[in-house]
Design a protein with these regions (language model features):
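A short, surface-exposed interaction/processing loop segment used at functional sites
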Residues: 157-159, 165
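TPR/TPR-like (Sel1-like) alpha-helical repeat modules
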Residues: 139-157
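Alpha-helical linker/edge segments of TPR/alpha-solenoid repeat scaffolds
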Residues: 141, 171-180
Length: 180
């Protein structure tokens, strides 16, 4: 199915392995309908509806990355259940590609403001930093190091990333502790 091929979560060990979206999540439905709107919508490039539909897809993918894994845990001897939403790290590559593609798509948009692209780039920078930390926290250290290297490559002017990977992790842990 095309929606899963384009927007589905990927195995971070092998991005050629694509999983289906979890339709229990409302974000999966938002992606589906926004993608339909992009496909069927106006053929005028850069119209407001296209930009808004791209935003819906983009924000829904980020939501799936942050909390799209649904875990149902039986309690009270199976008579009741607790439902937990957890990060779905398999959405990393899909989200990363969406950032790169969306930045490229609107880079040459006539009349675009610098804020449009700069806002996307700031979001991308934060996404990479958060992802490096998330993968580290879940024990995927090598993958976290690759993400951190990409962060340094894409944002060489950012002093806070001109550190070793270990120092980056220590700094992030300190930030998390201070935030409470």
């Amino acid at each position: 199915d095309e929606i899963n091929r384009i927007y589905g979560p990927r195995d971070y060990q092998d991005p050629n392995i694509i999983y289906p979206l979890d339709w229990r999540n409302p974000q999966s439905h938002a992606i589906y309908w926004a993608a339909q709107g992009l496909k069927m919508g106006s053929k005028t490039k850069y119209n407001t509806h296209e930009i808004n539909s791209d935003r819906i897809v983009f924000q829904s993918m980020q939501a799936l990355y942050r909390s799209g894994r649904i875990v149902v845990f039986p309690v009270d001897e199976g008579k009741a259940y607790s439902v937990f939403e957890m990060p779905d790290l398999r959405m990393y590559e899909t989200c990363r590609k969406a950032y790169v593609d969306t930045i490229a798509k609107y880079q040459d948009m006539p009349g675009r403001t610098a804020m449009t692209i700069e806002g996307l780039r700031v979001g991308y920078r934060n996404f990479l930093a958060n992802s490096a930390f998330s993968f580290y926290q879940t024990g995927h250290v090598r993958y976290a190091q690759r993400i951190f290297a990409e962060l340094q490559r894409e944002f060489p002017d950012q002093d806070k990333y001109k550190v070793t990977f270990g120092q980056f992790i220590r700094n992030r842990m300190a930030e998390e502790m201070e935030a409470g």
